[in-house]
């Protein structure tokens, strides 16, 4: 074991630079496919973060709606469950639709960009739908 320690140290020393992270690309000037893929993924992650923030607000609004309607009659409640059901169905649609979008460049270096672009676009649309729902619930 002691004999292997120097060899292991040398191996770790020599591979550390290879494991270092590459700097983030400037997405306004991205040209290489790798940079375009990274930027598309970043765009999707930002859209997803906004969706999650909006979804939490809509959950709170639907809980308030259920409380208000449930006070009138328990049979009127169910907005939160309907929201959850719709969101689960939407996630299935989004994932399938974006997998399909990737087939335009299946197996190629452009496939991740197409999938991420689709995910970002559909996620932004869903965020807008949820914001509209929340606004209607508040009125």
UniProtKB/Swiss-Prot annotation:
InterPro entries, per the entry: LprI-like_N
Superkingdom to which the source organism belongs: Bacteria
One family name in Pfam for this protein: LprI
Family statement drawn from the similarity comment of this UniProt entry: To E.coli YecT.
Protein name as catalogued: Uncharacterized protein R02472
């Amino acid at each position: 074991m002691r004999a292997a320690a120097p060899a292991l140290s040398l191996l770790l020393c020599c591979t550390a630079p290879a494991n270092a992270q590459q700097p983030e690309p400037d997405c306004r000037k991205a040209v290489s496919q790798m940079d375009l893929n990274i930027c598309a993924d970043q765009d999707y992650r930002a859209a997803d973060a906004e969706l999650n923030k909006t979804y939490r607000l809509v959950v709170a609004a639907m809980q308030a709606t259920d409380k208000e309607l449930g006070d009138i009659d328990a049979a009127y409640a169910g907005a939160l469950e309907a929201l959850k059901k719709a969101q689960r169905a939407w996630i299935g649609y989004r994932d399938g639709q974006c997998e399909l979008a990737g087939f335009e460049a299946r197996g190629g270096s452009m496939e991740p960009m197409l999938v991420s672009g689709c995910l970002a676009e559909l996620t932004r649309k869903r965020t807008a739908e949820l914001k509209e729902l929340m606004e209607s619930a508040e009125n």
